[in-house]
Amino acid sequence: QGKRLFLRFEGANSIADVFINRRHIGEHRGGYGAFVFEITGEVNYGKENSILVRVNNGEQLDVMPLVGDFNFYGGIYRDVHLLITDEACISPLNYASPGVRLIQDSVSHQYGKIRAVVDLANGNNAGQEVELGIRLLDGQKVVAQQKQTLTLAGNAALQQELTFEI
């Protein structure tokens, strides 16, 4: 308790319905992309819980690809992970991304400008102060680093951007 729980599927083909303790928590359509569902509010702490994943790999005209030069295998064919985070965390809910994107705005042999865009989320009703820190490394050497302290409103999500010029 006091943590957030996410199920991250790396691949299930082609329509996956996920149930926690017999309650439907979501559907994912598409066989080749990762997807995440938050299950925090569905878990019975201190008791046995069940996870059921029903996957349909029958032909679906609205789910790509429809044809290919490979076999269309069904079911869960890649790893599934249980992610456990603090209530305020880097969110995995943006299309199952790791929650951090690096954007190279300008790069040359002498100069680089890089933006780090971080998806933050607070799963608590109360606002929380968090510290966001990023270090850019060249091998073992720290090239640049930044830290920011910010307040996340209760049950809120935001994107925070840090810019590095090196």
Indicate residue ranges for each PLM-predicted region.
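Charge-dense, low-complexity intrinsically disordered segments
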Residues: 67, 152-154
